[in-house]
Design a protein with these regions (language model features):
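Anionic ligand-binding catalytic core segments
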Residues: 1-149, 153-197
């Protein structure tokens, strides 16, 4: 039955086949399964990125890997938009910055747009800006070039909007720049550029 579950992909979005999984404590997790076309253990790399991120002070939901079937691991991450079976309001940075596929087609979005949303509508502004900058530096360090606006998000708390825990942190060798510009014009994997903003 597991192969039937994995085969069609899912409605959870992203490039990898996924499913919601209930843990023994009734918490909801996302399972990211290996793909038939994988030539490396992507789950193991994502788990390594998770461990490095947490040790770098980046806030993330709990993650783990398990070998379920085949040659590669399955990556599990606890859903941060659920608590005691109830939804916590989450919105992507794509939505909260007022962007969509049409607006980003001709104008590459920037981390400065996320920072502007935090400054104008967020709570714990200094802490959230500091966390965002850590994520920029980390993405440069591991060449996470899949850092687009849908891979950043916000959670609505009783006090207001905060950055969600980081997610989908994966090293990549496919591109030579981030998906988001660091300033308004430049997306280079450059620590000095990040220091300048």
């Amino acid at each position: 039955w597991l192969s039937i579950l994995i085969a069609p992909g899912s409605s959870l979005g992203g490039a990898r086949p996924k499913a919601n999984i209930l843990d023994t404590d009734k918490s909801l997790w996302i399972a990211k399964f290996p793909s038939k076309s994988d030539t490396i253990d992507k789950a193991a790399w994502e788990y390594l990125a998770y461990e490095l991120a947490v040790n770098s002070g980046i806030e993330m939901s709990s993650c783990r890997i398990e070998r379920i079937m085949g040659n590669y691991n399955t990556f599990f991450t606890k859903r941060f938009d659920r608590e005691n079976g109830k939804r916590i309001h989450f919105a992507s940075a794509m939505t909260m910055t007022g962007n969509n596929e049409d607006t980003i087609r001709d104008n590459q979005p920037s981390y400065l747009e996320i920072a502007e949303f935090i400054s104008n509508y967020g709570v714990n502004i200094e802490g959230n800006l500091h966390q965002l900058w850590r994520r920029i530096i980390f993405n440069i360090a591991i060449s996470n070039t899949d850092d687009h606006l849908r891979n950043h998000g916000f959670i609505l708390t009783n006090d207001g909007w905060i950055l969600s825990p980081a997610y989908d942190l994966n090293p990549s060798i496919d591109k030579d720049g981030l998906s988001l510009n660091i300033d308004m014009d430049n997306n280079e994997l450059d620590f000095d550029l990040a220091k300048s903003v």
